[in-house]
Amino acid sequence: MNKKQLKIVTGVAIAVLIVSIIPMLWISQYLHPFADDYVFGAEVYKIWNETHSFPACVQTAWNVAMTMYHTWQGTYSACFLMALQPGVFGQYWLGTFILISSLVTSTYTLLYMVMRKLLHSSRLEYLFVSTLFVLMTIQFTWSYYDAFYWYNGAMYYTLFYSMSLFLASLLIGYQLSSSKFKKALIRGASIVLS
Protein backbone atom coordinates (compact mmCIF):
# COMPACT_ATOMS: atom_id res chain seq x y z
CA MET A 1 0.00 0.00 0.00
CA ASN A 2 1.50 3.35 -0.96
CA LYS A 3 1.46 6.43 1.26
CA LYS A 4 -1.56 8.02 -0.45
CA GLN A 5 -3.65 4.86 -0.11
CA LEU A 6 -2.56 4.47 3.51
CA LYS A 7 -3.59 8.06 4.21
CA ILE A 8 -7.04 7.43 2.71
CA VAL A 9 -7.71 4.16 4.55
CA THR A 10 -6.42 5.67 7.79
CA GLY A 11 -8.79 8.61 7.40
CA VAL A 12 -11.68 6.25 6.68
CA ALA A 13 -10.79 4.09 9.70
CA ILE A 14 -10.68 7.14 12.00
CA ALA A 15 -14.02 8.36 10.62
CA VAL A 16 -15.61 4.93 11.15
CA LEU A 17 -14.26 4.84 14.71
CA ILE A 18 -15.68 8.27 15.52
CA VAL A 19 -19.03 7.45 13.90
CA SER A 20 -19.21 4.18 15.85
CA ILE A 21 -18.52 5.90 19.18
CA ILE A 22 -21.02 8.76 18.79
CA PRO A 23 -24.16 6.60 19.26
CA MET A 24 -22.58 4.92 22.26
CA LEU A 25 -22.03 8.28 23.91
CA TRP A 26 -25.47 9.53 22.86
CA ILE A 27 -27.19 6.53 24.46
CA SER A 28 -25.41 7.22 27.74
CA GLN A 29 -27.70 10.17 28.48
CA TYR A 30 -30.45 7.63 29.24
CA LEU A 31 -28.43 5.66 31.77
CA HIS A 32 -29.11 5.59 35.48
CA PRO A 33 -27.35 3.98 38.44
CA PHE A 34 -28.02 0.27 38.91
CA ALA A 35 -27.28 -2.47 41.47
CA ASP A 36 -23.81 -1.94 43.00
CA ASP A 37 -23.83 1.70 41.93
CA TYR A 38 -26.22 2.32 44.82
CA VAL A 39 -24.29 0.20 47.32
CA PHE A 40 -20.94 1.85 46.72
CA GLY A 41 -22.19 5.37 45.99
CA ALA A 42 -24.78 5.79 48.78
CA GLU A 43 -22.47 7.40 51.35
CA VAL A 44 -20.86 9.75 48.83
CA TYR A 45 -24.30 10.68 47.46
CA LYS A 46 -25.45 11.54 50.99
CA ILE A 47 -22.38 13.70 51.65
CA TRP A 48 -22.68 15.44 48.27
CA ASN A 49 -26.31 16.36 48.94
CA GLU A 50 -25.50 17.59 52.43
CA THR A 51 -22.34 19.59 51.69
CA HIS A 52 -21.72 19.90 47.92
CA SER A 53 -18.06 19.57 48.90
CA PHE A 54 -15.96 17.49 46.52
CA PRO A 55 -13.10 17.05 49.05
CA ALA A 56 -15.66 15.69 51.55
CA CYS A 57 -16.87 13.28 48.86
CA VAL A 58 -13.31 12.11 48.21
CA GLN A 59 -12.83 11.53 51.95
CA THR A 60 -16.09 9.58 52.10
CA ALA A 61 -15.09 7.50 49.07
CA TRP A 62 -11.81 6.74 50.83
CA ASN A 63 -13.75 5.63 53.92
CA VAL A 64 -15.97 3.38 51.78
CA ALA A 65 -12.89 1.84 50.16
CA MET A 66 -11.25 1.21 53.55
CA THR A 67 -14.43 -0.35 54.92
CA MET A 68 -14.59 -2.67 51.91
CA TYR A 69 -10.91 -3.45 52.25
CA HIS A 70 -11.24 -4.47 55.90
CA THR A 71 -14.62 -6.19 55.77
CA TRP A 72 -15.22 -7.59 52.32
CA GLN A 73 -12.50 -7.59 49.69
CA GLY A 74 -9.15 -6.06 48.90
CA THR A 75 -10.02 -4.17 45.73
CA TYR A 76 -9.72 -0.84 47.50
CA SER A 77 -8.70 1.26 44.49
CA ALA A 78 -11.72 0.03 42.51
CA CYS A 79 -14.01 0.54 45.50
CA PHE A 80 -12.74 4.11 45.84
CA LEU A 81 -13.56 4.85 42.19
CA MET A 82 -16.90 3.05 42.42
CA ALA A 83 -17.88 5.15 45.43
CA LEU A 84 -17.08 8.28 43.40
CA GLN A 85 -19.16 7.16 40.41
CA PRO A 86 -20.62 10.08 38.44
CA GLY A 87 -24.18 9.11 39.36
CA VAL A 88 -23.71 10.41 42.90
CA PHE A 89 -23.28 13.88 41.37
CA GLY A 90 -26.24 13.41 39.01
CA GLN A 91 -23.97 12.88 35.98
CA TYR A 92 -24.12 9.11 35.42
CA TRP A 93 -23.62 9.55 31.67
CA LEU A 94 -20.04 10.70 32.33
CA GLY A 95 -19.13 7.13 33.22
CA THR A 96 -19.49 6.00 29.61
CA PHE A 97 -17.36 8.92 28.44
CA ILE A 98 -14.67 8.10 31.01
CA LEU A 99 -14.63 4.40 30.12
CA ILE A 100 -14.58 4.81 26.34
CA SER A 101 -12.00 7.61 26.57
CA SER A 102 -9.74 5.54 28.79
CA LEU A 103 -9.94 2.55 26.46
CA VAL A 104 -9.25 4.60 23.33
CA THR A 105 -6.42 6.69 24.77
CA SER A 106 -4.69 3.78 26.50
CA THR A 107 -4.76 1.66 23.36
CA TYR A 108 -3.39 4.49 21.22
CA THR A 109 -0.73 5.19 23.86
CA LEU A 110 0.50 1.61 24.11
CA LEU A 111 0.55 1.13 20.35
CA TYR A 112 2.40 4.45 20.01
CA MET A 113 5.11 3.16 22.32
CA VAL A 114 5.31 -0.19 20.52
CA MET A 115 4.97 0.96 16.93
CA ARG A 116 6.63 4.37 16.97
CA LYS A 117 9.23 4.00 19.71
CA LEU A 118 10.17 0.32 19.46
CA LEU A 119 9.42 -0.60 15.85
CA HIS A 120 9.98 2.88 14.34
CA SER A 121 6.84 2.67 12.18
CA SER A 122 5.63 5.71 10.31
CA ARG A 123 2.99 7.95 11.86
CA LEU A 124 0.42 6.79 9.30
CA GLU A 125 1.14 3.11 9.93
CA TYR A 126 0.78 3.71 13.66
CA LEU A 127 -2.51 5.60 13.23
CA PHE A 128 -3.94 2.98 10.89
CA VAL A 129 -3.08 -0.03 13.04
CA SER A 130 -4.06 1.71 16.29
CA THR A 131 -7.38 2.86 14.91
CA LEU A 132 -8.20 -0.61 13.62
CA PHE A 133 -7.23 -2.12 16.95
CA VAL A 134 -9.43 0.33 18.90
CA LEU A 135 -12.29 -0.15 16.44
CA MET A 136 -12.13 -3.94 16.79
CA THR A 137 -11.82 -3.72 20.57
CA ILE A 138 -14.96 -1.61 20.81
CA GLN A 139 -17.00 -3.36 18.11
CA PHE A 140 -16.25 -6.88 19.34
CA THR A 141 -16.98 -6.15 22.98
CA TRP A 142 -19.04 -9.02 24.33
CA SER A 143 -21.33 -6.87 26.50
CA TYR A 144 -21.52 -3.13 25.91
CA TYR A 145 -23.55 -2.76 29.06
CA ASP A 146 -20.88 -4.33 31.26
CA ALA A 147 -18.01 -2.65 29.43
CA PHE A 148 -19.29 0.91 29.00
CA TYR A 149 -22.70 1.54 30.55
CA TRP A 150 -22.70 0.04 34.04
CA TYR A 151 -20.10 2.16 35.77
CA ASN A 152 -19.29 -0.06 38.75
CA GLY A 153 -19.16 -3.23 36.70
CA ALA A 154 -16.97 -1.63 34.06
CA MET A 155 -14.52 -0.27 36.65
CA TYR A 156 -13.10 -3.74 37.17
CA TYR A 157 -12.83 -4.49 33.50
CA THR A 158 -12.64 -1.57 31.09
CA LEU A 159 -10.98 1.02 33.32
CA PHE A 160 -8.46 -1.32 34.91
CA TYR A 161 -7.67 -2.91 31.54
CA SER A 162 -7.02 0.61 30.25
CA MET A 163 -4.85 1.37 33.26
CA SER A 164 -2.82 -1.77 32.56
CA LEU A 165 -2.25 -0.57 28.98
CA PHE A 166 -1.06 2.79 30.32
CA LEU A 167 1.22 0.94 32.75
CA ALA A 168 2.70 -1.14 29.93
CA SER A 169 3.30 2.11 28.01
CA LEU A 170 5.10 3.59 31.00
CA LEU A 171 7.27 0.50 31.41
CA ILE A 172 8.33 0.71 27.77
CA GLY A 173 9.04 4.42 28.25
CA TYR A 174 11.10 3.61 31.32
CA GLN A 175 13.24 1.16 29.38
CA LEU A 176 13.76 3.62 26.54
CA SER A 177 14.52 6.63 28.73
CA SER A 178 18.08 7.65 29.53
CA SER A 179 17.11 10.57 31.78
CA LYS A 180 17.12 9.91 35.53
CA PHE A 181 14.45 12.56 36.02
CA LYS A 182 12.12 10.97 33.44
CA LYS A 183 12.72 7.55 34.95
CA ALA A 184 11.79 8.90 38.39
CA LEU A 185 8.56 10.40 37.00
CA ILE A 186 7.72 7.17 35.20
CA ARG A 187 8.48 5.18 38.35
CA GLY A 188 6.06 7.35 40.34
CA ALA A 189 3.31 7.10 37.74
CA SER A 190 3.84 3.33 37.53
CA ILE A 191 3.41 3.00 41.28
CA VAL A 192 0.11 4.88 41.09
CA LEU A 193 -1.14 2.69 38.22
CA SER A 194 -0.03 -0.50 39.94
Residue ranges and their predicted role:
Residues W93-S102, G153-Y161:
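Alpha-helical transmembrane segments of polytopic membrane proteins
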Residues I27-E50, F54-T60, Y69-L81:
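Extracytoplasmic catalytic/substrate-binding loops of multi-pass membrane glycan-assembly enzymes
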Residues I98-L124, F166:
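Transmembrane-helix motifs of polytopic, lipid-linked glycan transferases
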Residues A184-S194:
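Membrane-interface alpha helices of multi-pass inner-membrane proteins
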Residues E125-Q175:
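Membrane-interface micro-motifs in multi-pass membrane enzymes
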Residues M1-I21:
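Start-transfer (signal-anchor) and selected internal transmembrane alpha helices
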